[in-house]
Amino acid sequence: MALMLVLLFLAAVLPPSLLQDTTDEWDRDLENLSTTKLSVQEEIINKHNQLRRTVSPSGSDLLRVEWDHDAYVNAQKWANRCIYNHSPLQHRTTTLKCGENLFMANYPASWSSVIQDWYDESLDFVFGFGPKKVGVKVGHYTQVVWNSTFLVACGVAECPDQPLKYFYVCHYCPGGNYVGRLYSPYTEGEPCDSCPGNCEDGLCTNSCEYEDNYSNCGDLKKMVSCDDPLLKEGCRASCFCEDKIH
C-alpha cells in the first residue's frame, strides 16, 4: 500500500485598527524574517527541537531536526510564487519526499510564533485518537512532531495581491502525516528510549537517509527478505536503517 499524505494550512489576521501606519516598519521586519540569515535558521531549528522534546505524552523516538539547504530552496521557491495552496510533491522533493506546513498572515509574524501556532493545534488533539472535535485541524502539529522528520527548512515571501500578504512555507524531510498513523506521530515513551546511545538533550540522533515507499514494509520484510530487489528498492529505510529511526 502506497503512503498517503494529509496536508493543511493555517492563517492569522490582525484587526484593521492595528494595521495602520506600519508598512515601512513591516518591510524591515520581513527582511529580518529572511531564512537566508543564519540567526533565523537557528531560531527555526531551535524552536522545532524545543517543541519536539516537550511533547505530551513524551515520545521515545523523536529525531533532532537540522536545517537543510535543498529543502530551503524548494520552500522559498514556493513561497515566492504566492500560490496559497500546497505545492505538488515534486516541488518539495530533495533526496527525500518532504511534508509541508503553510501559514498566511496580514502582518509579519515571527517564525517562533508561526511554529508555535502550528504546535498549539495539540490543544485540540488526543494522542492516538485525533481531533477532539470534528473539523478541527491538527495536521500542522503532527507534522511538527513527526518522529522520523530530521531535516527542516522554511521560506517567507510578501504577496501584495493576496488579502493575507505574508506567506510562510516550511518543508519537513522526510514528510509525516501518513494515513494509517496520522494520530500517532511518534512512539509514546520516555525520551530516547528507542535510540539508546544516540540521544542528545532528549531527542534521537540516529536518523535514516532513506524512506519507505510503502506503509507495510515492516510486514513485507518479514515475509520476503531484503535480498529481494523489489523489496530493497521500495523499502529502503526498512532494509538499510534497521537500527535507525524511520
Curated annotation (Swiss-Prot):
Compartments, as annotated in UniProt: Secreted
Tissue spec: Secreted by the epididymal epithelium and then becomes associated with the sperm surface.
Record keywords: Disulfide bond, Glycoprotein, Secreted, Signal
Xref: InterPro entries: Allrgn_V5/Tpx1_CS, CAP_dom, CAP_sf, Crisp-like_dom, CRISP-related, Cysteine_rich_secretory, SCP_CRISP, ShKT_dom
GO BP: sexual reproduction
Signal peptide region: 1-19
Cellular component aspect of the GO annotation: extracellular region; extracellular space; specific granule
UniProt-recorded name of the protein: Cysteine-rich secretory protein 1
Organism of origin: Rattus norvegicus
